[in-house]
């Protein structure tokens, strides 16, 4: 399982660089613009320059509306700025067909510029609160649009977490659907160390965190702490080892 960490500034990216051995992907977002809020192109470039060259940089293009042209241009801006994972939050898509239309436009825009870039279609575990596509529709949207990964996050950051809205058995079905279509499965949404057991067991490919590695557990007011990144990775590795030998980890 890969660990994706989301700094919101160059300063935080430098903190991530200090913990580079413990993380796999540096994700650029702007939390005050939403769950998958897009940051500025120059911030993506500066963060790309700040972290080790062997660490991929991902970038969100926003909690996007159903406007395929607008979203495709935003996605191209992210990949031109140096991101190799492009994440799209299907916030304004109310049907699978709308999601597919948006994601096909993104895939074309991104892959025409950089064929090896990875495109991630993200739905929301709390979709029922905002009226967007059902979480279990996202793997099919990703597959039919030519994307590389399907993701779930939470749209409303009010202290509720991924498993509060989509229980582990439903997340496991999400992962299974993604894998059946040859996609990576990414899960996020106020994930904590306590969630790592079920996330590991269900075969999650990428886990995304911010609050769990911020001072005080606060994704907005807190700053990413290298020692918390290291601790989170250590717990991930412990669960991976114990899962590999069939021994349930004790939290």
Curated annotation (Swiss-Prot):
Source organism, top-level taxon: Bacteria
Keywords: Lyase, Schiff base
Annotated InterPro entries: 4HFCP_synth, RibuloseP-bd_barrel
Top-level enzyme category: lyase
Enzyme Commission number, as recorded: 4.2.3.153
Reaction(s) the record says it catalyses: 2 D-glyceraldehyde 3-phosphate = 4-(hydroxymethyl)-2-furancarboxaldehyde phosphate + phosphate + 2 H2O
GO molecular function: lyase activity
Active site: 29 (schiff-base intermediate with substrate), 87 (proton acceptor)
Positions of disulphide bridges: none
Main function: Catalyzes the formation of 4-(hydroxymethyl)-2-furancarboxaldehyde phosphate (4-HFC-P) from two molecules of glyceraldehyde-3-P (GA-3-P).
Family, as annotated: Belongs to the MfnB family.
Name by which UniProt lists this protein: Putative (5-formylfuran-3-yl)methyl phosphate synthase
Organism of provenance: Kitasatospora aureofaciens
Taxonomic classification: Bacteria, Bacillati, Actinomycetota, Actinomycetes, Kitasatosporales
